Amino acid sequence: MSRLYVYQKIGKLVRKYGTRDPFELLDAMHVQVRFYFDLHSTKGFSRYFLRQYFVGINGNLPREQQRIVAAHELGHIVLHAQALRNSPLFDTAVYDKRSSTEYEANLFAADLLLRDEDVMEAAGGPETDLGSLCLSLGAEPGLMNFKLRSMYMRGLGIPLLTECDSRFLARQ
């Protein structure tokens, strides 16, 4: 699956529902979202059961991290619907750098939550570093790395600052 395909899927969702907020998108798509306070190290999960998509999010996470997890799980629903119909995806075992589904869901979350225009404006000049870029946009470094990689691979001229790590949510 190409980065451009992921980006185009997000564009279609945003145009159709008029929002980039993952919780609003999940609601508009009739996905049941539940917060669980006993998930321990699991950040979230998505599953398909009885012809209905469900997303579970760790209720102990800070609100901004819950938004990232919601966007990530939405990515699984949009990009990996068939895989979800076969088996639920839990985000303790799936934050694996070698997993293409996790990489794609992280890319989806980054492109959904961070607009190209905002990143370009915040980047400003060649002296911008990852820390100041994240601070100005209120973004986690791992998420920002995925966004920068997406923009770079789509030819938007943003330099890559570090290698993307699909496990960035697992460490928090």
What are the language-model segments listed below?
Residues 1-172:
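Active-site hotspot residues in diverse enzymes, especially metal/ion-binding acidic/histidine motifs
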